[in-house]
Regions:
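Helix-rich catalytic cores of soluble enzyme domains
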Residues: 1-77, 81-109, 122-139
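Residue-level detector of short coil/turn "hinge" positions at structural boundaries
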Residues: 19, 61, 116-117, 152, ...
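Active-site lining segments that contact anionic ligands and/or coordinate catalytic metals
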Residues: 23-27, 77-81, 115-117, 176-179, ...
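Histidine kinase transmitter module recognition
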Residues: 110-111, 144
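Short acidic/histidine-rich active-site segments
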Residues: 114-125, 151-157
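Catalytic-core signal marking the mid-to-C-terminal active-site face
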Residues: 136-219
Length: 219
């Protein structure tokens, strides 16, 4: 995702579009897995790394923005816009209302990770077209986090947690190394044309299905 975003930044800034405008127009879409703490750390790491990538383009504040950093860069441009969607990988056909617990936990981890918006998958999506009831529940799941748990009132609520902070750093380091390897190979577009990206995704998907089949991973 970072390499993809950087490809847009590189192509458009080379075409003469100001870096601040490009960065503010890019929005990332992420899936949310059932690994609660890992997902919180994942979103935190993504925001950290994207801010570093954007900063390398030295984005200048536009006329309607005066949020400048220490070196005069536009800090608004470095903010990562993130939309997240709960997974369908772990949803069950049997006792389907248990899916509400799964999607709620995933939505909670995304909210704590700092996403801007999210889509909660209706609990019955795996076996039928969601009806009005299941769609209303899906909408209300995230509203409960906002209106009753007040998750939108605290900036980075996971900050200071020893476990999550260390997990964030670990994910950021691994993601950054992967990002650098893609860039050294010519960038995301080159990797996409060569089929490297698709091959990596397919291999990861195959490994996960195998882990579930061998009961080494719990859904």
């Amino acid at each position: 995702a970072l390499a993809w975003g950087n490809e847009y930044m590189s192509q458009l800034t080379d075409a003469g579009v100001p870096a601040a405008i490009v960065a503010k127009k890019i929005k990332f879409n992420f899936g949310i897995s059932s690994n609660y703490f890992l997902e919180i750390a994942k979103f935190r790491a993504a925001r950290l790394l994207w801010a570093n990538i954007v900063a390398s383009y030295n984005p200048e504040c536009l006329r309607d923005c005066d949020n400048k950093g220490a070196n005069g860069e536009c800090r608004c441009a470095a903010k990562m816009a993130v939309h997240a969607e709960t997974s369908t990988f772990n949803l069950t056909l049997f006792d389907a209302h248990v899916n509400l617990l799964r999607t709620q936990t995933e939505a909670m981890s995304a909210a704590l990770g700092g996403v801007d918006s999210m889509t909660v998958t209706p609990f019955d999506k795996t076996y039928e077209t969601p009806d009005e009831f299941s769609e209303r529940l899906a909408r209300n799941q995230q509203l409960l986090l906002k209106e009753e748990s007040h998750f939108d009132k605290v900036i980075d609520p996971a900050a200071g947690s020893y476990y999550i902070e260390n997990l964030t750093i670990s994910i950021a380091q691994q993601a950054w190394n992967l990002f650098l390897s893609v860039e050294e190979a010519g960038g995301f577009y080159v990797a996409l044309k060569a089929g490297t990206v698709q091959a990596a995704v397919n291999e990861s998907n195959k490994a996960r299905h195998k882990a579930v089949a061998q009961r080494r991973e719990v859904l």
